[in-house]
Amino acid sequence: KLRRKITHTFFIHKTFGNYFSKSVHMHHLTSYFRRKIVPLGETYNTYINMKQTINERIQALRLILKSKSISAFIIPSTDPHLSEYVAPHWKIREWISGFTGSAGTVVILDDKAGLWTDSRYFLQAAQQLEGTDITLYKEMLPETPTITDFLCQNIKPGETIGIDGKMFSVEQVEQMRRKLEAENIHLEICGDLSGEIWKERPGMPNTPAFIYELKYAGKSCQEKIEAIRTKLKMQGTDGLFLSSLDEIAWTLNLRGS
């Protein structure tokens, strides 16, 4: 009853030393806190603890990197199919950084860390990274170095940068390797190091795939495969390799949940 009767309220929100005062309608409170990435009802101490947890995860990964003589580790948002929207099992970048946007890459060094993301997420990333050891790098701005340029500036010749090769295309790896080797920096495919510290990681999706009905798909998978073969023949190509989940699902009329 009290919530329904109140039309305005004045409140002070403290976030890492900054104070925000705002006079708002009561029904705007939830959206305000959502923009601040602090759910309504969550305490300030819980918010602080979340940031501390992110920093602890980063430090744990740094210890693994040090044990393997790796000076930096690159964590993209993708899964092994290079999807932008991934299953919880593959949300490694989100887990290590606290940033929940669909696109972004985290780079962890011994003394610094950064997140690169595009303009869709500049505001969200700034809010979610606040209080962590991670610096936001806004992609495509003149003053923002690319990840490779950043690494060349911060990694010494002879040192090694690690990646999980499953999460990158061959082209991406080749481009990075060319630039890094020009600076005598090594690129090593060393597996999923983050998984070694993510103790409560969700399991791999195991729900069954199902056939998408022809009345919705429009064409059978046989028709689609024959159309692809016709295109390949026209271009003098022997075969086509598909790894993207949406392309596989479309071609074979498969869906999942």
Which ranges hold each PLM region?
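Extreme N-terminal basic, low-complexity initiation segments
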Residues: 1-13, 214
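Short hydrophobic alpha-helical segments enriched in small aliphatic residues
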Residues: 9, 14, 24-29
